[in-house]
Amino acid sequence: MTRTRLSRRTMLTGTTALATLVAASREPLAQQTVSRSAAALSAPLPPRREFVIRGANVLSMDPNIGDFAAGDVHVRDGAIVAVAPRIDRTNVQIIEAGNMICMPGFVDTHWHLWTSALRPLMRVDNAERGYFPVSTRLGAHYTPQDSYANVRLGLAEALSAGATTVHNWAHNVRSPAHADAELRAQRDMGVRGRFSYGAAQGMPNEQPMDLAGLAQIQKQWMPNDGMLTLGICSRNIGVSQTALRGTISLDLVRQEWGGARKLRLPITLHTSGPSPIKLLEDAGLLGPDVQLVHPLLTTAEERQILKNRGVSYSIAPIGESGRPAKAGVIQLAEMLDAGVKVSISTDLTGTFNCDFFQCMRILYQQHQHRVGSRIPLTAKRLVQLGTFDGAVDLGIADRTGSLAPGKRADIILVRTGDINMAPMGDPYEALVMLAQPRNVDTVIVDGRILRRAGEFTALNYAQVLREATESAAALRERAGWPS
């Protein structure tokens, strides 16, 4: 199959666009419309074509369609037209997918993409160089172009791991121009997602977040073509003395959440440490527009509140499983048993990777260790958590999360003949217990083939990496961070 390659002219265009982006960061946001359009050229997206994925082991994640040991998926104009054992069409591209699993792309429901290039500065064996001190100190020195470069690097990793939707948990929005840069990066990379606008690192917890800037961003960016949605990420809430970035008062919560709700925007919140759920319930603040993150210390009463209010919970298995015992345990079993909506997320990639296969594996192993068969958990249920349930969490299950006619074509192909996968038995079991990101062969988002045969089809990854590396070096210098 012919793969799209960047010409020298395209690469020069991308370099010019980056310079335009840097200049644009110095302009008022209202003057950046032309600059934003030019910056999009730095990551040209492949066109949407009509094609049929042929002969794959299809896992639709739709109970009305089911699975096919050998099946086809027809895509046209970015949408799924049909899913069936055999689809015959003439004059369309055929993607041969024998010895591959065809499934919905993973939906990541919580990722601090702005920290992606800080990886060389973080360490797990040195508390002074852990995620919190590094991101807090360097976060204060971010420019819009740093935000752009970091988000693009993170989304490149997301695509390589089979994530087609990412919730960008942006808790370092230093200005509307920074938010604009992150949204541009999400759009330019062609990944579906939500951008949650948050307070800047280092902002005093008595100071309200920039609701006027949030409204400005909403006016500029929403509605769009359905690829991106908008929300807010709240700072920590309650009286916890362990929150490393402190907490905000309930009065400020009412002000900020009320401002978001006036704009009809969803809200997301970390709940590390003592749970604020009862506090929020007593204040009348919980609802189906709220997503919580890190279910580690909830009570049975709180889980019933979450179910009744329609609140969802995002689990970040890799990071959460490495926390000290006093921080709690991943309460997947308790959440499922209570009927709370649950999804999976990466959290950050400073000290680990985007790897949904590992996330599912950790959840299964911890579940078996804690509760065994008392609360059944199947491999298929875990794959559902990583795909359809993530779309439910983000409120976009009408367009993604499963393979069904009318939905947008967010699809991945996973090779089953690779040495770590073959010979394959049950496909769900293989995905959860055996698969790795390197097995992801093809990634399709909204009908655009962004990766094929394990390679980007159009993105100049070397450029993305170079810009992110330069950003990290510049941030370290501006912050006076030791090498």
Question: For each of these PLM feature ranges, what is it?
Answer:
Residues 56, 73, 78, 99, ...:
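Divalent metal-coordination and catalytic microenvironments
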Residues 119-191, 215-224, 469-471:
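Alpha-helical scaffold segments that flank or form the walls of functional sites
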Residues 117-147, 240-243, 274-289, 307-313, ...:
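Active-site gating loops and adjacent loop-to-helix segments of metal-dependent hydrolytic enzymes
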Residues 315, 322-331, 340:
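A conserved active-site cap/scaffold subdomain adjacent to cofactor or substrate pockets
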Residues 42, 177-304:
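Metal-coordinating catalytic core of metallo-dependent amide/deamination hydrolases
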